[in-house]
């Protein structure tokens, strides 16, 4: 028999949905990262469209109430014609370039830790509000059963969409996790610390005044790079989230010690900027203790954290050496 083409019939089983529902992430706090990065992308787009009259309108609001978590932004919103593609289909994202999110698989991450996900959105210029209900509890039951389903069959079984009138000048996206049973997600202090170390927010005024601004005066190039960073105003239960860096720390002798001046650097290849960053030490060049949440040098892309504080540990000859520094590396090469 000669070579012949045989037709195929590709399908995706139900366990693909399990991956999209956060099964690949061991840390439940990633839920905050996924939704905030989507909000930041939407806010960036809204800003580019001139929808904000004031900078403080570029805001993400996170609220914990009882066992519910809500993440709300005033970004561009999802257009009515794109709701099914963006909020029901899997991995349809068209994001490129300066978008923090990429593949369109993060929106169901919270379904691993709650009984129901609710997405509400309205796009600027459209008189509609769309609401998507995803029954996460039912989805988990189906995935745990021995019944065989294709992924799209399960999505149809657990998802509903409704539409109602909305004012055309409204633009927003809101995701609510109902009946959250993962206690770490409901822990306000843990959530605020995770957000401060992860999402693209600005530094506190005191840290900028005492550590960064004096160094910027001597390094105008890096001040320009800093001003070009993506930042969003993130509020948690009404309180603003800032990066956790401070101008003083408590050392191993339980004494308060000042952080020294910031030093800047950049990485280039054949004249092309790959990354830039800053670092600092204590005035006495002592180690930052484990109680200092911002110790070590961190990696960021589009001002969103990549990995955690241990990312660069293998570059030091001794593990302890990494604790002498604080700082950030901002990758800019795509």
Give the location of each predicted region.
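Interdomain "switch/hinge" adjacent to the Bergerat
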Residues: 1-11, 46-100, 125-295, 304-305
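Conserved ATP-binding N-box helix of the HATPase_c
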Residues: 23-61, 106-112
């Amino acid at each position: 028999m000669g070579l012949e083409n045989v037709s195929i019939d590709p399908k995706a089983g139900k366990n693909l949905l399990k991956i999209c529902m956060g099964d690949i992430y061991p840390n439940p706090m990633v839920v905050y990262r996924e939704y905030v990065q989507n909000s930041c992308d939407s806010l960036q787009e809204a800003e580019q469209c001139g929808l904000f009259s004031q900078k403080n309108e570029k805001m993400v609001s996170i609220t914990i109430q009882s066992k519910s978590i809500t993440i709300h932004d005033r970004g561009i919103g999802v257009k009515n014609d794109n709701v099914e593609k963006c909020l029901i289909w899997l991995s349809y994202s068209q994001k490129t370039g300066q978008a923090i999110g990429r593949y369109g698989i993060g929106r169901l991450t919270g379904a691993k830790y709650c009984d129901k996900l609710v997405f509400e959105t309205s796009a600027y210029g459209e008189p509609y509000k769309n609401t998507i209900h995803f029954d996460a509890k039912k989805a988990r039951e189906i995935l745990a059963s021995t019944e065989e389903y294709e992924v799209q069959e399960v999505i149809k079984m657990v998802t509903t969409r409704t539409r109602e009138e909305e004012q055309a000048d409204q633009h927003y996206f809101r995701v609510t996790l109902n009946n959250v049973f993962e206690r770490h997600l409901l822990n306000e202090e843990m959530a605020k610390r995770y957000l401060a170390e992860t999402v693209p927010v600005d530094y506190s005024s005191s840290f900028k005044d005492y550590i960064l601004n004096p160094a910027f005066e001597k390094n105008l190039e890096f001040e320009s790079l800093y001003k070009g960073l993506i930042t969003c105003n993130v509020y948690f239960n009404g309180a603003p989230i800032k990066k956790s860096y401070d101008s003083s720390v408590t050392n191993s002798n339980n004494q308060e010690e000042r952080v020294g001046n910031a030093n800047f650097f950049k990485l280039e290849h054949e004249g092309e900027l790959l990354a830039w960053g800053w670092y600092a030490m204590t005035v006495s060049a002592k180690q930052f203790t484990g109680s200092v949440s911002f110790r070590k040098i961190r990696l960021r892309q589009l001002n969103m954290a990549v990995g955690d504080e241990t990312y660069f540990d293998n570059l030091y000859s001794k593990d302890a050496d990494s604790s002498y520094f604080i700082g950030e590396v901002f990758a800019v090469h795509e």
